[in-house]
Amino acid sequence: MTKPAILALADGSIFRGEAIGADGQTVGEVVFNTAMTGYQEILTDPSYAQQIVTLTYPHIGNTGTTPEDAEANRVWAAGLIIRDLPLIASNWRSKQSLPDYLKANGTVAIAGIDTRRLTRILREKGSQNGCILAGADATEERALELARAFPGLKGMDLAKEVTTAERYEWRSSVWNLESDSHPEIPAGELPYHVVAYDYGVKLNILRMLVARGCRLTVVPAQTPASEVLALNPDGIFLSNGPGDPEPCDYAIQAIREFLDTEIPVFGICLGHQLLALASGAKTLKMGHGHHGANHPVQDLDSGVVMITSQNHGFAVDESTLPDNLRATHKSLFDGTLQGIERTDKVAFSFQGHPEASPGPHDVAPLFDRFISAMAERR
């Protein structure tokens, strides 16, 4: 027997559907993602903390879920919205159906609504604060009240909420088809020591760095620069993460100290925005952000166009770039800034996700550039 669910947006829009996850309520910023695959990776991406994700592809759940595809040890998305849930999940790697996975993680979700109508609202009006109520006692009035009470992501520091509690070492590499596993690489086979700041890091980022020879020390978001420099790293990586970058004063200050050294710095997503702020630029809140796996981005140096995976609601304001920063990549959807590099230091960053998961690997060579920068410094 199905349970009813209600989705309410702060603008007053109401959608009724079927509860497919945990009972209860959830609030957050409602966004839409256009990826056709990778729903488990999306749900477990810490960058989606405090966001309710609408998946525009109509059939979600076809292949079930498996622990190997998770990007974190839990679901971080505040909720899930889909059009249609298949009756059967079929895949040789599947360990659990999507509804069972959502319930096990306490994730509230709704299916059976018009996601095309919802996406048009979000595209035209911008991301909306929203609420999903799941259960027989759900009312439109209560859902709307909770949606309008959510403060929004502007000014919200979420990196310190999703980061690791303690420092740890990481040696796991990318998935191997023959062994059906993520092999552990001996430390002796990893020539570069990289300290990775966890602002909400995805596991596939760590795996791709290991696959390129990096011995990783992952540190909490609020780790002072002095502690990192004491580890004598070959490079410093600034991870993806959720929320507004501007309140992350602790991260901005640490990055400024790193930029006083000659250690190569590479940032992704939130790390990209933090590098910009540490260099004197400013960031802004986008209308509906970029969330998907089919976003065209142009390399301004070569003219090459790459299809990229994107997940961000904030962006670096190109008009505020100081002389020590130059633009390297731009979105061909809306012209927003996608990449920067310091003109006086070996420090660069990219707004999208070179590691994909889900999505294409067109921008993966940025990892190789980071490796080359460390090799040249030796």
From Swiss-Prot:
GO biological process: 'de novo' pyrimidine nucleobase biosynthetic process; 'de novo' UMP biosynthetic process; cellular response to amino acid stimulus; glutamine metabolic process; L-arginine biosynthetic process
EC number: 6.3.5.5
Keyword set, alphabetical order: Amino-acid biosynthesis, Arginine biosynthesis, ATP-binding, Glutamine amidotransferase, Ligase, Nucleotide-binding, Pyrimidine biosynthesis
The reaction(s) this protein catalyses: hydrogencarbonate + L-glutamine + 2 ATP + H2O = carbamoyl phosphate + L-glutamate + 2 ADP + phosphate + 2 H(+)
Annotated signal peptide: none
Catalytic center residues: 269 (nucleophile), 353, 355
Residue span of region CPSase: 1-189
Self-association state and partner proteins as the record states: Composed of two chains; the small (or glutamine) chain promotes the hydrolysis of glutamine to ammonia, which is used by the large (or ammonia) chain to synthesize carbamoyl phosphate. Tetramer of heterodimers (alpha,beta)4.
Name of the protein described by the UniProt record: Carbamoyl phosphate synthase small chain
Biological classification of the source: Bacteria, Pseudomonadati, Pseudomonadota, Gammaproteobacteria, Pseudomonadales
